[in-house]
Amino acid sequence: MRIEYLKTAPDRMGRYTLGLEDGSKLLLYRQTIEDFGLYTGLELTQEQYKRLLAAVSEMSAKMRAVRIVSAANVSKKDLENRLVQKGEDPAQARKAVSWLSELHLIDDSATAETIVRACIAKGYGRSRARQVLYEKRIPRELWEAALEDYPDQTEKIADFLRAKLKGSQDPKLQKKAIDALLRRGHSYGAIRQALSELSLDTDDFPEEE
């Protein structure tokens, strides 16, 4: 397999385009070019071509993995899933995740703690935080440690109710605010306590459900 051309300028992702005699193209990172000693006119044996394809696939998965973890907090499972969804080979996706883990660039425990801190900052209740951990594919055995110091949300709930109700006793307005709090993952008990602190009627409000 002959290399017809190898562009000298990379694209915006840092990849160089290599054209082969059969009309196919490969997008290569500089490291792969140097590892294989590639240049225009080089004749590749079938074995070399096979190894080149494997190296291109491996490097593609690794570089995409780096971009993903640089832009978002992801778990290992979430990262692997995203890589496959983006078209990376499943085996190479797993290898890329292991590679980042070995470099300590992805850590499910640290990611879980970051997610929980973000949930607290957004005023979410504990159950909503658990839902986010599930959605991010954080292993369940890490949940309790991440949630261990979840603060009491009564004051935040009360602040939310003050802002939404503005002193109104309108049952419909109260229900709307309470429904919003439930969607945020706050328990009936926590909401009831906040209602009591604001001297709002809780007679028909369940303590838990």
Describe the function of each predicted region.
Residues 1-209:
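An alpha-helical, amphipathic repeat domain used for nucleic-acid recognition
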